[in-house]
UniProtKB/Swiss-Prot annotation:
This is Thiamine-phosphate synthase. It comes from Anoxybacillus flavithermus (strain DSM 21510 / WK1). CDD domains: TMP_TenI. Binds 1 Mg(2+) ion per subunit. Belongs to the thiamine-phosphate synthase family.
């Protein structure tokens, strides 16, 4: 079930958008996203009540279409909203502590290598986000790209872990990422910066699903 939810994972905050974030999410949902992460970080990001209000409106849209709503690195916000889960990075709150706080909500953990995958699983993570696969412009603090070979390496040792790949993934590279062993792709700019968001999202969704069906996943 989780592996299906990860197929097209849209990550977004207000500063990622050149259009109204609510309109962007509406178009992305129509195009076929299967999971959504609210990531309000970086210079100019909303805080306090403004952040809460935007998250609340985005959550309402996800609820209407049964799209899991994940909050990036803000357990308090996730609990206040009754979101579906939390995603944390290696430099964020410790995964074990987050699991204790959120109970049976979804827990996702950013990883960059096999050792971090094993630690995430020990913390009872529901999925891992591996990346950046390719160089990315969406995160100022992004680590060095790990490439498709890291997906293959992790999949060789952890065949069952739900794994979504993130970082510089485009319409041109999505198929390769799935073929390497990822259960889905997580994208920010590939949707946020698209001129026609619905059409771009639909193409990405169809590409991922074709690749997954071909690989019998």
């Amino acid at each position: 079930m989780m592996k299906q939810k990860l197929s097209l994972y849209f990550v977004m905050g207000s500063i990622d958008c050149t259009k109204d974030p609510l309109a962007v999410l509406d178009e992305a949902i129509k195009g076929g996203i299967t999971m959504f992460q609210f990531r309000e970080k970086g210079k100019g990001a909303l805080t306090g009540i403004e952040k809460y209000r935007l998250a609340e409106k985005l959550l309402e849209r996800c609820r209407m279409y049964n799209i899991p709503f994940i909050v990036n690195d803000d357990v308090d916000l996730a609990l206040a909203l009754q979101a579906d889960g939390v995603h944390v990075g290696q430099e964020d709150e410790v995964a074990e502590r987050v699991r204790d706080r959120i109970g049976d909500k979804y827990l996702g953990v950013s990883v960059h290598n096999l050792n971090e995958v094993k630690k995430a699983l020990a913390a009872c993570a529901d999925y891992v986000g591996l990346g950046p696969i390719f160089p990315t412009v969406s995160k100022e603090d992004a680590k060095q790209a790990c490439g498709l070979t890291m997906i293959e390496h992790i999949r060789a040792h952890e065949k069952r872990v739900p794994l979504v790949a993130i970082g510089g993934i485009t319409e041109q590279t999505a198929k390769q990422v799935i073929e390497a062993g990822a259960d889905g792709i997580a994208v920010i700019s590939a949707i946020c910066r698209a001129e026609h968001i619905y059409e771009q999202t639909k193409r990405l969704y169809e590409m991922v699903m074709r690749a997954k069906q071909k690989g019998d996943r």
